[in-house]
Amino acid sequence: QKCTMTSLCAVNPRWKAGKVPGCAYLESWHCDITEFLELRKNTGDDRRRTHDMNTANWIPDLFMKRMEKRGKWTLFRSNDVPDLHDLYGKRFEEAYENYEIKAEKGEIWSHTIKAIDLWKQMLKMLFETGHPWITFKDTCNVRSPQDHVGIIHSSNLCTEITLNTGEDETAVCNLGSVVLDSHLASDGTLDHDKLKETIKIAVRALDNVIDVNFYPTEAAKRSNLRHRPIGMGVMGLQNALYMKNIPFASQKAVEFNDEFMEAICYYAYEASSELAKERGVYKSYCGSKWDRGILPQDTVETLEEERGESISVPKSSKMDWKVVRDKIAKYGMRNSNVIAIAPTATISNIMGSSPCIEPT
């Protein structure tokens, strides 16, 4: 990790926007996890610290189950369990438990700790340093629209995108964000016509970027041209709530959040499908969840089936999704990924708006 951070720092003088962004992810079963958690601490041996690199936990559901039951958690060396990196859900659980049996027999190295103790350490470091961030491996993979062509091994610097990566492909995503407070009518309601037109233009523009972009590696170019992911996000939620005279921490704010995000998703999916009619579907479309008629909101049920328990999230909708579903079934999708809520810390200042969906 220290070598990676040093490489990032070496590029900093050429990065006009500030420090070069970078983030390292580590799975919770890795034998170095306890040291990894302390990489951003301001105390201790500085040779074991990475002050200029972000860190994130990549947590499987099995760890959370063990933690809730106050059970044990086994750490392994990655070279002893090479397939765990590429497994998730029930297949991961089966393989992990088989490795635990091998470890008990002394066939491979292991170290056993209490799952609750590791979880407490994760939270302690998060409160003290803001790192490592908490991300969930199984949720990202089970709900991925591209589950037919690879595995998601991490998110990105800001945890807003989850794309497949591998030795031959480096995930790349082109991001853009709608200024929400510019899409309210004079009476404070959401201007659907304006929002639809903005998103239609933005999706086309982001798709164009894929073809004209500069790629530092062939793996990045190969991935982007094959899957064509884009990330439509939003900024200005706090400004919009202020204009509507709605407190940020209120039920009305939650309801408005559901309303505008449903609209953004609706118009973005529709725009990508219409673009597919014009330009063709992305190369790896066949076999994807889009191709199978499964939209992102449908994957909550997929995750419930995987976990064998209900997930308490609102599942109602206000818009006629049959229209979008029919278009996708007929024309397909131009982009494998469409929505991503980026932090917009810099561009929101340029636009004179509040950052993403956060209060300021």
Predicted regions, residues:
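Hydrophobic, well-ordered secondary-structure elements that form the walls
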Residues: 175, 237, 345
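Active-site proximal loops enriched in glycine and acidic residues that flank catalytic Cys/His/Asp
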Residues: 137-138, 177-179, 340-343, 351-354
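Active-site cavity-forming subdomains of large catalytic enzyme subunits
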Residues: 1-180, 184-192, 215-221, 268-289, ...
